[in-house]
């Protein structure tokens, strides 16, 4: 569960630094605002596709950073 919390907090930091609402983030992955909240709190598992879509929305273009976060998502599940 520690990895879920770590990944969730990193996703929240990225979302907030870009000024994106939970609602907009949820819309981008076909989910609710509450699912984004649960993801950011580490309470649910992560789908690689959702993490990829969120990273794109949040403007994370650096391949090393993307790979690191996607690897963390795989390990968190």
Listing of model-derived features with the role each one plays in the protein:
Residues 1-72:
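Basic, Lys/Arg-rich alpha-helical nucleic-acid-recognition elements, primarily the DNA-binding modules
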Residues 75-77:
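N-terminal low-complexity or simple alpha-helical regulatory segments
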């Amino acid at each position: 569960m520690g990895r879920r919390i770590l990944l969730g907090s990193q996703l929240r930091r990225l979302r907030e630094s870009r000024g994106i609402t939970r609602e907009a983030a949820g819309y981008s992955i076909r989910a609710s605002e509450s699912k984004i909240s649960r993801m950011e709190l580490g309470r649910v598992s992560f789908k690689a596709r959702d993490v990829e879509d969120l990273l794109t929305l949040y403007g994370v273009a650096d391949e090393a950073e993307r790979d690191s976060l996607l690897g963390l998502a795989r390990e968190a599940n």
